[in-house]
Curated annotation (Swiss-Prot):
Belongs to the ZPR1 family. Residues 222-236, 465-477 have a biased composition (Basic and acidic residues). Residues 213-243, 442-477 are annotated as: Disordered. GO terms for biological process: protein folding. The lineage of its organism: Eukaryota, Amoebozoa, Evosea, Eumycetozoa, Dictyostelia. It is found in: Nucleus. GO terms for molecular function: protein folding chaperone; zinc ion binding. This is Zinc finger protein ZPR1 homolog.
Amino acid sequence: MSEEIINKKLENTKIEEKEEEFKNISHENEVTEIESYCVNCEAENGITRILLTKVPFFKEIMVFAFHCPECGFRSSEVRSGGSYELKGCHIELNVTKELDLNRQIVKMEKATISIPSLDFEIPPSNNGSLNTIEGIIKEAITNLTNASEIHTESKEELLGFVSKLSNLLMVDEPFKIIVDDPSGNSFIENPNAPKADTNLKVTNYTRTAEQNASLGLGINEEQQKQQQEDSKKNERVTTTSVSIPSGDLADREVYSLPNQCSYCGVMGECKMVLTDIPYFKSILLMAFSCDECGYKTNEIKPGGAISEKGKTITLRVESVEDLSRDILKSDTANVIIPELEIEVTHGSLGGKFTTVEGLITIIKEELEKNPFFRGDSSDPANRARYQEITSQLDSFIAGKKPFTIELDDPISNSYIQNLFAPDDDPQLKIVEYERTYEQNDELGLNAMNTENYLNNQEENDNEAENEKSEEKESDSK
């Protein structure tokens, strides 16, 4: 499909009217027709019909259908019309049983699917797709089988690999499937949602400059040069101003640093302030704003050293006043609501400094973003469970029902306000625990060396030099 056609249509679509442009599927949807070039017979009177609509799972999409009256050539294409997420997503699923093959998967056009055990990768494509894990593997088997008929010289090798893919469908041994999508719009279904899935791990990451460029979010060379000059100036100004002096006044002083916008790639300004939470510790509040695209975000980073033990904080919410308690959820903490069997794993929400009511509202909004709970294509049982959970959350937010909220933080950087401080709060329970080896490993503490690291570095350098000299000697022989 010609990029000219797409750009021409998008130029005519105003951003502020996006919600009106992308309507739910119905017979009343407006179809735009554009005269376009036929790549088959080179006629210039082909017709491209464009439909902007909303489809379950895919949110907003653009449907393109081309027909040439001269030669009869037809083609169709579907593209995502929704906005990119603020961060990319890396999804890992451990397939341990045949039932896992039925999980639905949304692969957007910028996503890469890989199976590490076979060193197999499905690269980004022009079109997004909605499928199951089994469907993705069967589609790969079909494509490789067809390729073996064309490339006869490597037929045996391709068919051997097809056999390996077919064996995966038996799930005789567990295997891992990974979806990496810099646009952040791909999903793998969690059938236990909103409960945590031990076999599913989702990590959000900040896109690189190359990934932003591939999404069309990059900046041109002139802007890059200007940013480099500005950053050099800011470095000279900031180097002396960022060092935080001692004293209470410094804790309230706001510091600014240049930072690249993860949404559009243009340099914006990140403001930071160091402050204290009574009866807890110092925290760093960071707020970023971009004058170019208007993107704004904020983040909380607790200060101080990593605690020796983890901590579980349990609050029994019994009144409207409890909903107003301050709560700090660090980016390493899990949020658990036992009454609904909800567990929001660390990394899902990031660091949040809000109230109990605010945190419950954020959890509800995150649930509403899950495409497998919405639309007429969703499973009826999942949809009913989702509606029940959101109804219960609304009751909690309105203060109509008591509930329990629990923060499980392996590095003790989370906090819930004690209304009776410095005395004990009868509704608040705090329990410290020893971290497991796996938790320390995930936090990078097992590999951390804080003693004699200079000597260890010298030993590693000497070992590397010895290995190089041995390789040279063996090559000379």
